[in-house]
Swiss-Prot record:
One of its GO terms (biological process) is innate immune response. It is found in: Secreted. GO terms for cellular component: extracellular space. This is Beta-defensin 110. The keyword 4Fe-4S does not apply. It comes from Pan troglodytes. The keyword Nucleotidyltransferase does not apply. Belongs to the beta-defensin family.
Length: 67
């Protein structure tokens, strides 16, 4: 079991960490912040006078923009 943990940590250290340093723009995208920067609000349901453009954090919440 310890050897498996060692190989898992080694695999993580060799593959994921260098990729995160090389491509930080793909690491984590805060969709909630992006929605707020576009004058939107994260809601479960958009009203009739709002446009749904994307998901916020979960697939159940939408970024709603005023028309």
């Amino acid at each position: 079991m310890k050897i498996q943990l060692f190989f898992f940590i080694l695999l993580f250290w060799v593959t994921i960490l260098p990729a995160k340093m090389k491509y930080p723009e793909y690491g984590s995208l805060d969709l909630r912040r992006e929605c707020r920067m576009g004058n939107g609000r994260c809601k479960n349901q958009c009203h009739e006078n709002e446009i749904r453009i994307a998901y916020c954090i979960r697939p159940g919440t939408h970024c709603c923009l005023q028309q």
